[in-house]
Design a protein with these regions (language model features):
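Sec-dependent signal peptide recognition
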Residues: 1-7
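Active-site-adjacent structural segments surrounding the nucleophilic cysteine of cysteine proteases
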Residues: 16-41, 49, 53-54, 160-286
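Short, surface-exposed coil-to-beta transition loops
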Residues: 75-78, 159-161, 168-172, 361-367
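Solvent-exposed loop/turn segments at secondary-structure junctions
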Residues: 233-237, 244-245, 264-270, 298-300, ...
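Surface-exposed patches in mature extracellular/periplasmic domains of secreted proteins
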Residues: 150-154, 253-260, 288-298
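Long, charged/polar, surface-exposed segments that mediate recognition or autoinhibition
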Residues: 16, 35, 39-41, 46-158
């Protein structure tokens, strides 16, 4: 009874906090009134000045990678984002000190002792910063709303977070700080937080949705639309960012920072595809989806099996300078080309004398195969680098030359 009275007292105290007090504590005009969830998402993005990251038929995301002097709760955030469904905000995520953004020198960039020493210092500093941000944020939120309650988010051991939770007018403020990983403050509806952030899209609905996303263009392109974009930013998070895209596309809630923890990403980036798959498995299967790993040649005649079902393919490859030059140039050249026969001849002429692409093991990368064109032997790829990289085209034979041989599909 005493415990219930304590929770009730905390709840009443938090309810008395005004919108103005909350916005002042955050340092941002987040709330126009006491209910964020009925606001127009574009209006929210406008007053926050956060750019749109992605928009699909059903949802949208907005993300800002702030400058160094940007502050929220008087702490430095490295990534600020929110998701919206049917143009209404559904969740907000603030990522403070973390091992991905706080370490700018990746392991593969260490060429000499000076770089090695600088990287070691960054690793020491980010671990201290995580502890400091976690302490400061908890103190500020407690001062604002009262003492937190303890809970957890996520339905899988590898992606589960212990959180400190404060409720305010239908909003749950959740602070997570896994040791040496990151400090995240998320704002969800109380209902969503009570459900652990989980959601469920029925198989029938998802199957119909996936089939409707297969676009067959008059020029012969077959392309998947409505794949969420997640911009990994400057860190080496291509694997967790791509997995977040695929999981959200298949109706499974995901966050690249949590997936990076599950995949045991190194400081500054660098993640094992196998470790990510193992870490995400429980979340994917818990949503009644399945993970399939295949080793196939990158070719329209092999990827069509999945694309025609509305399923994107996560592809492990080597993203070399030469590969990207070809993909960028080819994509630009093919714009406006409506005749597959003429385009096939143009590509063949351009490739005369072209040397085979050479894989570089220092340029490991994971992206998506999202389309194909059988008349020309092309495949479409999508990278987690923002809208400019949502759809690029490359010959299947060229893609095979830089392929690591592993592809992963989240299916029904």
């Amino acid at each position: 009874m005493r415990l219930m009275l304590c929770f009730l007292a905390v709840g009443l105290a938090a309810a008395e906090v005004t919108v103005e007090q909350v916005n002042k504590a955050i340092g941002l005009e987040l709330f126009a009134d006491a209910n964020l969830w009925d606001d127009d998402a574009k209006a929210v993005a406008g007053r926050l000045n956060w750019p749109q990251e992605s928009e699909t038929t059903n949802d949208a995301s907005y993300r800002l990678y702030p400058k160094e002097d940007y502050r929220l709760f008087e702490c430095r955030p490295y990534s600020c984002s929110f998701l919206a469904d049917q143009n209404k905000p559904t969740s907000l995520s603030l990522m403070f000190a973390n091992k991905g953004d706080s370490v700018s020198i990746g392991a593969k960039d260490v060429k000499d002792r000076t770089k090695a020493k600088a990287r070691d210092e960054q690793i020491k500093d980010y671990k201290k910063a995580i502890a400091a941000d976690a302490k400061d944020l908890e103190e500020k939120l407690t001062k604002l709303f009262g003492k937190p309650t303890l809970g957890s988010m996520g339905n899988a051991q590898a992606t589960r977070e212990v959180v400190r939770r404060w409720n305010w007018n239908g909003h749950a403020f959740l602070l997570a700080a896994p040791k040496d990983e990151y400090v995240a403050l998320r704002i969800l509806s109380v209902k969503s937080a009570d459900e652990g952030g989980r959601s469920r899209v029925s198989d029938a609905e998802l199957f119909a949705r996936a089939k409707s996303r297969v676009e067959k263009r008059p020029n012969g392109d077959v392309i998947l639309k409505d794949i969420p974009m997640v911009n990994q930013g400057p860190k080496g998070y291509c694997v967790p960012a791509t997995w977040e895209r695929a999981m959200r596309y298949m109706g499974v809630p995901a966050d690249m920072y949590v997936l990076a923890m599950a995949g045991q990403s190194g400081a500054g980036g660098g993640t094992s595809v196998v470790a990510i798959a193992n870490g995400a498995k429980a979340a994917v299967t818990g949503a009644y989806r399945k993970i399939e790993t295949v080793s196939i040649k990158v070719d329209p005649g092999t990827v069509d099996k999945y694309i025609d079902q509305g399923l994107p393919i996560m592809w492990a490859m080597f993203s070399t300078k030469e590969y990207n030059e070809i993909a960028n140039g080819r994509t630009k050249e093919r714009q406006g080309m409506t005749d597959p026969v003429a385009w096939k001849k143009a590509v063949a002429d351009a490739r005369k004398g072209q040397k085979p692409l050479q894989p570089n093991r220092n340029e490991g990368h994971v992206c998506m195969i999202v389309g194909y064109k059988k008349q020309t032997g092309e495949v479409a790829v999508s990278d987690s680098w923002g809208p400019d990289y949502e759809e690029r085209w490359i010959m299947g034979v060229e893609a095979t030359q830089v392929s690591q041989g592993t592809m992963t599909i989240i299916g029904f």
